[in-house]
Every structure is written in structure tokens, then in C-alpha cells.
Regions:
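Acidic, mature catalytic/reactive cores of soluble proteins
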Residues: 1-330
Length: 330
């Protein structure tokens, strides 16, 4: 889900099931190969497309996800139906709950904020509290999700042991190795908090790009012992972040954080003009948007007129239009 806590309830289901069938853990987690990956039409864009400077000169995070045009154009893909991630031969990829857990925990770990305290709201929505809808634009992160991540990782480290292997998509195995390699550098003092965050965020963005349309179908066998080693290292990093949050809150853990960019450079073209994010137009001062949905109204009013109007471009006559130019020129 777009909301940063939509994944929290998964462990409730696992815990409830195992409270009744504790002897079925191995079958539930490792043996059942009928799980699939939901193939969403929405795509969380990289930082280069969502980090913007508003008219007040402050850096914000807007337009965090888009509907992927290439995916929509794919034969058989229906944005209003349930789609499952496939391999290039158009076969649905099946996997185990173990791999689903690894993927979820890895992706959330890779979304920890620059201080390692909260999970970033980079999907554009906060948690259950909609009154906090402005937080994602302020580089918001939340500690409730950090504790849920700690809970999920504890399940992995408690139950993934031994020389037996877990078969997973090659892209996920690479994602796991790449994040662990940067964490090793961080633990050895080779990179700062900011450099660690930047490198891991880049790895996350590259992973998303690699699986955006398909999984390759290539697989990698990873031992449970190695998985345990990696996630134990992740858990140690999380614990340090929680300690930092407790210290910041004078003994109480803050629920949310916002972040402010104190040093930045605007991206300009060869003529020195600002580069705008494709697909979103910053409204010039004094201009009003064409309202296309209630969400647009709410967002525009909430941002005090300093926001985006989705799916709009400026036409040849200088007026806004709902048309959208695709990469192929149509």
C-alpha cells in the first residue's frame, strides 16, 4: 500500500496461525511455493524525480509515485484487476513465504532514514493517521514501522537456521548482498551515516528498476545461515537507531521525524534553467490548476497553492491541458 504502515499486519497473521499450528512453521514458511508478488501499476520514482525545490526555496519530496506507462501498455495488464509479477515468458512467478518475508524486511531496512531511526515515507503517505499527510513531503519517517521491522527481522533470525537453502529471484539475492556490503563498510567506519543512506537508497532504486516490468526468472540458492547472518547485522543497525531515537526523545521514542535539507544544489539545464520533473508541473505564482479530482483539490489547498497538479502539461497555446506526452512522442 501507499501508506507506510500497510504491511504491519502481515506478522499478525503469521503469529495467529502459528499459535494454533506451531508444528506447521516449516511447511508454512519454507515448503509452500504458491505465493506470488503483486504487480502494482504504481511505481515509486527515484530521488532524482521527486526531490524538488519549492517557490520558497526549500527542498521537498513530491510526486513520489507514478502509474507506469510501459506496464500499462503491456498486453494483458489491467490496472483495475489483480496482476501478478511475471517472467519475460509471461509466466507468473511463484515463491515461498520465506522469500516474501526476506523481500519485505530487506526493502523496509533499505528505507531507514539517514539517522537509522525511522522508516521513510517515500511512497507518499504516512501511517494510519491521515492528519500527518504532509510528512512525506518533509522527508518524513516513522518509528512504529521501525519496531514492526524489528519484529519481522526477529522472526527471520529465530527461524532461518542451518545449511538448507532458500531459493529466491536472483534480483533479490543481489539486493540482499549489495545492502549487506554497504552495511559492512558502515560498520568498519568507511562511510558516514549520510553516505551509507545514499548508497543504500541508490541500491534500492536500482533494484526497483530491475524488477519494474518482470523478474528475469533466474534464481539463486541462499543458505539459511547466511540469511540469518545478514539479518542479524540488520537487527544490530536497527537497535542502534532505536537507541538514538530514545536519546533524542529523552527516554520516550518519538513517533515521527521530519528532515530538512541544509545544503543542496538545484539541477539546471545547459542554459542554466531549472529542470522540472517530467509528468508534474510546478504551478507558477498566481496560476490556478485545472481540477481533475478531489485529491487534486485537497492536495493543492493543503500545500497552500504551492503544489503540483497531476497529469498536466502546458500546451502549445500556453494553457494547461490534461494531455500527457509519452516517451514515444504520442
Amino acid at each position: 500500500g501507499y501508506w507506510s504502515d500497510h504491511w504491519d499486519y502481515n506478522m499478525d497473521l503469521v503469529d495467529n496461525y502459528l499459535s494454533i499450528f506451531p508444528d506447521k512453521l516449516d511447511e508454512l514458511v519454507f515448503k509452500d511455493n504458491t505465493y506470488k508478488f503483486y504487480d502494482s501499476v504504481a511505481y515509486v520514482v527515484p530521488r532524482s524525480e521527486k526531490y524538488v525545490i519549492n517557490k520558497k526555496g526549500a527542498v521537498r519530496q513530491y510526486g513520489m509515485e507514478v502509474e507506469d506507462e510501459a506496464k500499462l501498455a503491456r498486453p494483458g495488464f489491467n490496472k483495475w484487476a489483480t496482476n501478478w509479477l511475471k517472467t519475460p515468458d509471461e509466466k507468473i512467478y511463484n515463491t515461498t513465504l520465506a522469500v516474501k518475508m526476506i523481500t519485505l524486511a530487506l526493502s523496509k531496512f533499505a528505507q531507514l532514514d539517514v539517522d537509522g531511526m525511522g522508516v521513510e515515507m517515500e511512497g507518499g503517505k504516512p501511517g494510519w493517521n491521515d492528519a500527518m499527510n504532509g510528512l512525506p513531503g518533509l522527508f518524513g519517517s516513522g518509528t512504529p514501522e521501525t519496531f514492526e521491522l524489528k519484529r519481522l527481522i526477529k522472526f527471520i533470525t529465530d527461524n532461518f537456521n542451518g545449511s538448507e537453502t532458500v531459493v529466491m529471484p536472483a534480483e533479490i539475492a543481489k539486493y540482499l548482498d549489495d545492502v549487506k556490503a554497504v552495511l559492512d563498510k558502515y560498520n568498519n567506519g568507511q562511510v558516514s551515516d549520510f553516505e551509507y543512506w545514499d548508497e543504500v537508497a541508490t541500491i534500492r532504486e536500482n533494484y526497483r528498476e530491475s524488477v519494474k516490468l518482470y523478474l528475469s526468472g533466474e534464481e539463486t540458492e541462499v543458505s539459511k545461515d547466511y540469511i540469518n547472518e545478514v539479518f542479524s547485522a540488520f537487527a544490530a543497525k536497527i537497535d542502534k537507531g532505536i537507541e538514538k531515537a530514545v536519546e533524542m526523545g529523552n527516554g520516550l521514542v518519538p513517533t515521527y521525524f521530519t528532515h530538512e535539507a541544509v545544503d543542496f544544489e538545484p539541477v539546471v539545464d545547459e542554459n542554466g534553467n531549472p529542470v522540472f520533473t517530467w509528468g508534474n508541473i510546478m504551478l507558477p505564482e498566481g496560476k490556478k490548476p485545472i481540477v481533475m479530482s478531489q485529491d487534486d483539490v485537497c492536495y493543492y489547498e493543503y500545500m497552500d497553492g504551492d503544489g503540483f497538479a497531476s497529469r498536466m502539461v502546458i500546451g502549445a497555446d500556453g494553457k494547461p491541458t490534461c494531455e500527457m506526452k509519452l516517451d514515444d512522442g504520442t
